[in-house]
Regions:
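Active-site histidine-anchored catalytic micro-motif
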Residues: 1-139
Length: 139
């Protein structure tokens, strides 16, 4: 069995979903593994990872709006507010989603469905550099 590890860095410009499918696929392809399991891990507490609809922008807008409703930016609602009104809601949104994904590689390609994409979900308003750790095991 072969293993590969690495990091991918992304610069987010704002809150919302950033499609990172292409960059992840390129990294996995460069490892030369045909059959295996790819794990992605987001090294942050105010960003997360999701697999979601990649064809309809309205679906992404609805997801972003939903999280804005269930974890609103209200400075008076949270005790933890040292970094601004978007800080604690960002932590809550990351908690409600996930910071790691496991995706099978079959025939050298990620086994995503036709309409699935991998998204980095930025929960803070201002730009950030986000780092993902990747691990690929297989043959």
């Amino acid at each position: 069995m072969r293993q590969a590890t690495g990091f991918l860095e992304f610069r987010t410009e704002r809150q919302g979903l950033l499609d990172i499918t292409r960059e992840v696929a390129e990294w996995a392809d460069a490892q030369g593994v045909r059959e295996g399991l790819l794990t992605l891990f987001c090294r942050h507490t105010s960003a997360s990872l999701i697999v979601q609809e990649n064809a309809a922008p309205a679906a992404r807008r609805d997801i972003e709006a939903y999280f804005a409703r269930i974890a609103p930016e209200d400075a008076h609602a949270y005790e933890h507010d040292e970094e601004g009104p978007d800080d604690m809601p960002a932590h809550l949104r990351a908690t409600l989603t996930q910071v790691q994904l496991s995706i099978p590689l079959i025939g050298g390609r990620m086994a995503l469905g036709t309409w699935q994409g991998i998204y980095l979900f930025e929960h803070r308003r201002r730009p950030h550099r986000r780092t993902l750790a990747l691990h690929l095991a297989g043959e």
